[in-house]
Amino acid sequence: MDDELDYGSDHSIHGDVREDLSDSELQLPKDRLDAIIDRKEKIATEKAFGINDSSDKHLNVSIAETAALRKEIGASDQNSHLDSIYAHGVEAMDEFEIQKMFANFRPEKVWKKDNVAMVQFQYRRDVAAMMLNMSKMMRRVRGRKKADEEGEVLSDDDDVEEGQIMQEKDDDVELIEDLKPNEKGIVASEKNNEFITVDINAREVPNGKWRVLTKHVPANMFVIIRYATTDEYQTMVTSDRSQVKKTGVKRGNDSFWTHESSNRGGLNVFDKEGKELEWDYEHDTRFYNEDKNEEKVEKVKLPQGIKIKGRGAVKCGFLFGEGSSSLASDDTTPVKKRRTDEKDYEKDDIVSRQGSSAHAIRPGRVERPIRERIQFPGREDPDEY
């Protein structure tokens, strides 16, 4: 038959995929070209079957967001390993707990030494997405006592006015009077929730610009992260195994139909011991009503039908309601819908905070979707930037 499928071809179902490739993509090596074709065929198949990839929405970040994030932290290709983070304050956690903390963003490897750890992710965009969804920029402040009855202020910062910004430990420090930090050194602020304000007199913080983890972290822990520098990455990778614990994390087999990985994150809810709870996915019975305010409509009772007798009446009687000729399915209550396993994150609006200077876009330029990003030299994946 002329319309019979060619099962000997790898691309028989979507024969037009190769025609959609650009000239630059056609010049790529065969293995990378095959990867692009496979990905586009997968997208086309999902679209044909109406499969929506909603589980990875938290991984989507734009070029502008990534550029603004790196600018705020001071990271670049020249000084940082952009697929890895450096975490400080994880002395009470083992490698598995650290991996589980970032599980929704596809961590690959974990190295831990004393109270610091380095986590390498699958792609650079995963690191950016994790930072924007799981952390907030740290703002350093220093408290100063209020003046006493005689008007004297007992402080080493007598020459510095309140609110003045100073440079200490490669970061900005603001002087504020009468600070009241909590046990972790964090100062609560109702006016500004874009930053985590930390009193450096109450908590010692390493040099540089850091972001404070706000998701999947026990209440009694203070964990800060940033991009790992090139020197830190080389030191951690080449260290003796007796000093540095290394954990290789399996990626898990992504299901074509469910897009779920075998590495699952927790609920961001912790017990008294500080352990994060997780759902029992095998016996999960969470259900919900889609509309609680749904009006109750009284059913009009139909007159009782004539009882049917004859061949098949007994065998098929379960189809009808008791003493009625109407189908039993018409009288049953609908089954409640099950909650979907969506990742609930609130992304840091870093582009708005930094303004238009964070990422200059030429007039007329249109940012393409994440799957159609341009190929940068030296990247292993077209989506990596």
Curated annotation (Swiss-Prot):
Coiled coil: none annotated. Residues 1-20, 326-385 are annotated as: Disordered. Residues 8-20, 339-351, 364-385 have a biased composition (Basic and acidic residues). This is Protein kup-1. It comes from Caenorhabditis elegans.
